Amino acid sequence: MGTPAHPDLASVLLSRAEDGIPISHAVAVHERRSSFDLFAAYNTAVWPALVVLWIASAVVSVLLLSSRRPPDRWISTLLAAHWIWSAVAYHAVFFTRINPAAWLFAALFVVQAALFFWAGVVQGRLSFTLRRNAWAVVAWLLVAYSLLYPGINAVQHLTWSRIPTFGVPCPTTIFTAGLLMLARGASWRLSIVPVIWTVIGGSAAFLLGVRADYALPIAGMSLVIFTLQKSSARGVREAHETPRIRVRP
């Protein structure tokens, strides 16, 4: 199903200008309508897959909180699936209809999926643990928020068919940020694309008025601070573990 037809942007701007409405406002309204039409087409076409992805993510999250922790490779596989799904099903198939830059976004998301698959599934370097510290609280708040994301948007927009739901880039990024804060063995490279998307998606959230995405900058800043703090602690630890050579006079 394609997106519903609307007047092109030039026609909209001309009409709004004749009505005395600022062009910047007209552009924002047009972009918002086009985006929500896109969400409607996306949700209608792939909703069964979105339900499966949400259930899988919720089950893994609950198991991670319980004593029956799922295998780390399963969690890494789920994260890789999130990113490749957003790359292909959302960016490449749908978002490119209204934004050519979506091809670049799709490429970034494919890279992130490949990183998770390589580090977590092939090499098995990622270990997701139930920590008990301040960062764990932040991590679980982000995970919970991402799972509640469809409901938060539904409260604001009221129409399920036209809202951003699970299985789109923004909740994927928030969910990923939370799990990365619970992961041992995660390289800082795994945080690059998620942080980039918190900037891109966060700016779009304010333009389109998607309030559920206002959490993106918080997720991004939290992940940056967490990653820098972890890298600093690792550097200090390695410095203390390096054998010192004493030179006797």
Predicted regions mapped to residue ranges:
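Membrane-proximal helix-loop-helix units in multi-pass membrane proteins
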Residues: 101-177
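Short juxtamembrane and helix-loop transition motifs at transmembrane-helix boundaries
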Residues: 13-16, 32-43, 63-71, 93-100, ...
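Hydrophobic cores of alpha-helical transmembrane segments in multi-pass inner/ER membrane proteins
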Residues: 51-62, 107-122, 169-182, 216-231
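N-terminal topogenic module of multi-pass integral membrane proteins
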Residues: 2-96
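Membrane-interfacial loop-to-transmembrane alpha-helix junctions, especially the N-terminal start
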Residues: 70-80, 131-138, 184-194
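Loop-to-transmembrane alpha-helix initiation sites
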Residues: 100-105, 207-221
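Membrane-interface capping segments at transmembrane-helix boundaries
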Residues: 121-125, 228-243
